């Protein structure tokens, strides 16, 4: 019998326009997580759909040719990469986040060799914060930001590579 452990194979590829549109218009999250719908903020939507703006910083993550989610990687200081990420709505909340996040961190390390990785998360998103803490992101500070036509509190977190 075949007892080999399944190794999750994630592939990172630069996001195409078609993929950006698929994510922007068809990914809808439930309840308070609808905050993360691209269409919830016109400005974010326009930025996300603009290939020049996305540049080569946005990657789609696939597994067996299925889109699992996406990551953005932005160099914010000489040795610091700030990441953004999103998972396909029907995969959220089922314990897939940790593997997905780990894959993104590994990809960032191998591609950019940062000393530090940062991210910002809405403070109401306790579910995500728990996952970030699990792989040793630490809390840096909270800040207020205008988005989706309102002001929200965000938590900045940091990971030492």
Q: Which residues does each PLM region occupy?
A:
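Short, Lys/Arg-enriched N-terminal segments with co-localized hydrophobic residues
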Residues: 1-7
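A conserved beta-turn-beta hairpin within the catalytic core of GNAT-like acetyltransferases
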Residues: 75-83, 92, 111-115, 149-151
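C-terminal "cap" of GNAT-fold acetyltransferases
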Residues: 114-118, 122-129, 135, 142-161
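Solvent-exposed beta-strand sheet faces enriched in polar/charged residues
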Residues: 74, 84, 118-120, 140
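Acetyl-CoA-dependent GNAT
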Residues: 10, 14-84, 88-90, 160
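Conserved acetyl-CoA pyrophosphate-binding loop and the N-cap/start of the following alpha-helix
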Residues: 91, 95-104
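Active-site acidic-Proline motif in GNAT/NAT acetyltransferases
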Residues: 88-90, 94, 123-124
